[in-house]
C-alpha cells in the first residue's frame, strides 16, 4: 500500500511539472515595451511601434554594400506597412511588395530575429534577414511622420 501511494504521488508531481512546462513554453507573448523602438544590424534597420489589437507599425531600411573598380557602391531598399503579431512573432508584408514576400519578425531573448521569404523588392541583394539588436526604445520617427 505504501509503495502504491508513493508511485501515485510521484506520477502526480510529474504530471503537474509537465503541465507547468507546457504552459511556460506556449506562453511566448511579448509586451509593447519589448517590441517598440529601433532595431539595427550591420545592413539594416527596423522601426517598430505597437498600435494595439495585435498590430504593429513597421518600417525597414536596408543596404547592400559592395566594391567595384570605380570604388565602393551600395544598393538600398525600404519597406513600410502594418504587421500582425501573435505571441512573440509578427508577420510583415511591406506595402507594394510582391505577393510572395513575407517577413517574419520573432522577438526572442531581447533580440529581433528576421527571416524573409520571396522577393520583397528592396533592391539587388538587399534583404531584411538577420538578427537585430535594439538600439532605442523611444518612439521612432517614421517616414510618414
Where are these regions (language model features)?
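Amphipathic/hydrophobic helical signal segments and adjacent flexible N-terminal regions
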Residues: 2-45, 98-100, 115-145
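Central antiparallel beta-sheet cores of small beta-barrel/beta-sandwich binding domains
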Residues: 27-102, 133-137
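Basic, alpha-helical nucleic-acid-binding regions used in initiation and control of genome expression
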Residues: 112
